[in-house]
Structures are given as structure tokens and as C-alpha cells.
Amino acid sequence: MPAKKGAVPPEIYQLKVTLLGTSPPIWRRLLVPSDLTLAQLHDVLQAAMGWQDCHMHEFSVGRRHFGRPSPDDRLMGMPPVENERTVRLSSVLGRVGAKAIYTYDFGDSWEHGLLLEKRLAPDPNTAYPVCTGGQLACPPEDCGGIGGFYDLMDALGDPAHDQHDELLDWVGDDYDPDAFSVDDVNRMLTPARRHRGKASKN
């Protein structure tokens, strides 16, 4: 459906995404259209951080929870989950300084702090979303959460550790915890680029 004549282009949100509990922090800075649904934002966060989207996830803002609702949630006594496909980013993060939590993998419980740093006018020559900065590679999937990740780093950094060789084989020779490239992240974000500083057609 074509955008209505005179439709206002979505604002661009500058978000800082920090993997909580990491030191030094693993983080990304992203420019994303404010009219993304939270389901679309999930895809952006997976690509930007370097996750593989192998597990469940959820957004939380205050007492509200957003994700993929299941009839089993109520039976298990879990808080009600709003459908992330119908909620836009601008409706949950509206003011500069607003925060949310994005949790990925309920077993390892990777919690990401989302901070709205700026609200910007869109650049008509830029395809969004865009990564503008960051630091360090995200942990390997299924490594046991923050505690397991740092135990893994200790073992990989100590050739005398009794599990050094086994864990090195598990993560693979190409895993570098210090690696980060804006260009690489932006290549991963390419499939999510639907906005070029113009109004959404949705």
C-alpha cells in the first residue's frame, strides 16, 4: 500500500545496546527507524550483536513484556506477553534517556540494555538500520551465560588449563573475543534495510 501523500518519515533513533554484566562492556551503537516493530528490532539486534537467533527472546519495558505470546504462558504463571509484531519501537521508547531490556536465550539469559540516546531526522541518502560503533565480539552461543562466558575466556587464555584444548576446539580457531568491525556488522544488517529516510509503506 503506497504511503499517504505528505506522510511524515519516521524519526531515526540512536540506540546504545550493551550486553549487561560484561566488563569491559560489549556494546553496539545503532541508528534505527522509530517505526520498526519490536519483532523487526529483534532481527536487527541479532545481526548487530552477532547472535544466531537459536533461542527465545523477550523485550521488557517497566512492567510490560513483549515477545511471541504462547497459550502456555498463562498456564505456567508467566506475566502476560504482548505481541512484538504489533508494537512499534516509538510506542515503548519515546523520550531520550528511555531504557528497555532485551533478553535473548532464557537459559543463558543474555540481557541487553537498550538506551535511547538521540532522536534524529532521517538522512534521505542513508539506508537504515546502521551500526556506527561498538566494541568486542558477542559471546559464543550456549556457553552458559555471563559466568560461563568468563570461565570460557579464562580457559582459552590459559594453555595449561585442563579444558583449554577441548574448549578451543569447541569455539573454533576463528573466534576472537576482541574482534569488532563496523563494516562487518553493517553487512549483516543489509537484509534489514527497508527504510531510506522516507515514510514507511506499511
List PLM regions with ranges.
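Short linear regulatory motifs enriched in tryptophan with gly/pro/ser
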Residues: 1-202
